[in-house]
Amino acid sequence: MYRTLFSLVLSRFDPERAHRLAFAAIRALPVIGLGSLLRRFTAPDPSLAVEALGLRFDSPFGIAAGFDKDGEGVIGLGALGFGHVEVGTITARPQPGNDKPRLFRLLPDRAVINRMGFNNHGAGAAANRLLRVRRARRRPVLGVNISKSRAVAVEDATADYLISARALAPVADYLVVNVSSPNTPGLRGLQEREALAPLLSAVKAASGKKPLLVKIAPDLTDEQIVAVARLAVELGLAGIIATNTTIARDGLSSDPAVVEAAGAGGLSGAPLAARSLEVLTLIRANVPPSLCVISVGGVETAQDVQRRLDAGATLVQGYTAFLYRGPLWARQITRGLSALRSR
């Protein structure tokens, strides 16, 4: 039914407006008392629970950063069946993001191009909000994804990250350093070892005992990916998230004119699946089994999630397919996982 509604109605809305409307409904779920009722319908089978990062996840499937930028919908997203919610990306300074339009659907590819630019209310506002979330009786595992403020020079990035880390580590279950978005100038250069090692070391020190992960791009070479993986192990990070969106446009089914009109930005969704799986396999081959690897990119079905788990993922995230498949997507994934495992 949702796919029909999407095809006939929602796909005609501006993508960012459609997101705002859907997110408002999700935020409202606990306010109007539907959260507890929904949980009875969406709760994953207990057999799907995962122990990772010193935490218990109700299922291996969560929603990636980007959907809930400021931590306003954590409880509602948990009620929809996500085992963890990664909020953000959050920056030290509030910022409006890039000019609109900045979000574009590629319907034939079940994909999205975004150049949002980390629009968010800043680390201070998020910390106050997430403190209330942590006090909730029922909530999913809470990850917080942080990155550099756009107004801050790359040379000053570490100090900027530290502001966010110190504010948000106390209210997060785990913290993620995002150095891989293509929508902040100069950010991806921080993935080079010479820049990344001191940055991660500083954030790790500022985060105390909070599990720290780094999120990387799919556009790195295999050699660069191995280098980051080995650095994460060397520095004692808790894990790696692979991958962010891609700047590649290879193999798309959408009209090239539509793709060109969308312009610059990160591509997410089904076209990213193959590369994301490749990166996961490469990372897992170069890190110990104890390191948490979260796979994200092109995940649509329970079969996709199980394939990532079989390839060595500790946890799996999705986002873009949520826009195409609707509010019961997490439930479909967890029910599907249970069915696959009962065969």
Curated annotation (Swiss-Prot):
Cofactor field: FMN
Superkingdom to which the source organism belongs: Bacteria
InterPro entries membership: Aldolase_TIM, DHO_dehydrogenase, Dihydroorotate_DH_1_2, Dihydroorotate_DH_2, Dihydroorotate_DH_cat, Dihydroorotate_DH_CS
Binding residues annotated for FMN, in chain numbering: 65-69, 89, 145, 178, 215, 243, 269, 298, 319-320
Pfam families assigned: DHO_dh (PF01180)
Keywords: Cell membrane, Flavoprotein, FMN, Membrane, Oxidoreductase, Pyrimidine biosynthesis
Name of the protein this chain belongs to: Dihydroorotate dehydrogenase (quinone)
Organism: Leifsonia xyli subsp. xyli (strain CTCB07)
The organism's taxonomic lineage, starting at the top: Bacteria, Bacillati, Actinomycetota, Actinomycetes, Micrococcales
Protein's gene: pyrD
